Design a protein with these regions (language model features):
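Short glycine/proline- and aromatic-enriched beta-strand/turn motifs that initiate or cap beta-hairpins
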Residues: 20-83, 239, 243-246
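Solvent-exposed loop/turn segments connecting transmembrane beta-strands
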Residues: 129, 160-162, 185-196
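Transmembrane beta-strands of outer-membrane beta-barrel proteins
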Residues: 25-29, 79-81, 134-140, 183-185, ...
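Residues on the lipid-exposed face of transmembrane beta-strands in outer-membrane beta-barrel proteins
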Residues: 26, 64-68, 119-123, 137-139, ...
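Repeated loop/turn-to-beta-strand initiation elements of outer-membrane beta-barrel proteins
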Residues: 73-76, 129-131, 176-180, 208-211
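Predominantly the C-terminal beta-signal and adjacent terminal strand-loop region
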Residues: 193-245
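Transmembrane beta-strand segments that form the barrel wall of outer-membrane beta-barrel proteins
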Residues: 177-192, 217-218
């Protein structure tokens, strides 16, 4: 019995690398804020907008993903997705933010940072010539910070936390090379919500390389005594995927 178990482990050790397909994915482009409303603390601070009350600049972004496909249906990936957007301007009223009161009509510089680290498992339930569909789970770590600065004043609110979300992927094949992709992570709860969704056209260059172009939506926020923040970002996205064992 022990010999059989040992042989099974050895067999899996040899077979799994043969069935596995490691990959890397790079995504880049530009991101702009649609809205970004902030009140810190959530029950006592001044509510203001980093997009309507201040002017938010578009910025360059990138994302890096390492993937590992086992067999035909099991997918594991790790994602690093940094985001930093700056805003500036003047407000005609005092702003209470993170325990600091910023005087009215002073020059304000704000930085909104929302970096995320995600580990995803997805199972592809449907694998057909014209359609692919999978569902899974993403463990997301957010590393967020909002800072506000004016001459002689500075305050920052940081937040690191765990967010479980549902992962999904739908791919429609138009022909052997062209397809339309809908994928993302999303979940809503009483404490808040989070959506990160990509819609893109995908083109197969060869058996190892794939490129895509599309639109990404990042939206979500939380409302509690500590933080009130809801934001939405539009991404113009270009991506490239390379599979090593294919």
């Amino acid at each position: 019995m022990k010999l059989r178990a040992l042989l099974a482990i050895v067999f899996l050790g040899f077979v799994t690398p043969l069935l596995a397909q490691p990959s890397i994915d790079i995504e880049t482009g530009f991101v702009s804020a649609v809205y970004n409303d902030v009140r810190i603390p959530g029950d006592q601070g001044t509510l203001f907008s980093l997009t309507d009350d201040l002017m938010a600049a578009s910025s360059f972004f990138y994302r890096l993903r390492a993937g590992y496909k086992i067999g035909e249906r099991h997918n594991i990936s790790a994602l690093y997705a940094p985001l930093s957007v700056k805003s500036d301007g003047y407000l005609p009223y005092d702003v209470s933010f993170a325990g600091v009161v910023f005087p009215a009509d002073s020059a304000l510089d704000a930085v909104y940072k929302f970096n995320s680290y995600r580990l995803t498992y997805r199972y592809d339930f449907v694998l057909r010539p014209k359609i692919e569909f999978g569902l899974g789970f993403t463990a997301k770590i957010r590393d967020a910070a909002i800072s506000l600065k004016s001459p002689g004043y500075y305050a920052e609110k940081t937040n690191v936390g765990f967010v479980p979300v549902i992962n999904f992927r739908l791919l429609l094949h138009m022909n052997d090379r062209l397809g339309f992709l809908l994928e993302g992570d999303a979940l809503a709860a009483p404490q808040g919500r989070a959506e990160d969704i990509l819609i893109a056209a995908q083109y197969k260059i060869n058996d190892k390389a794939m490129m895509r172009a599309g639109y990404r939506l990042l939206e979500g926020g939380a409302d509690n005594d500590e933080v009130y923040n809801f934001s939405m970002f539009n991404y113009g996205s270009l991506g490239f995927t390379y599979t090593f064992n294919n």
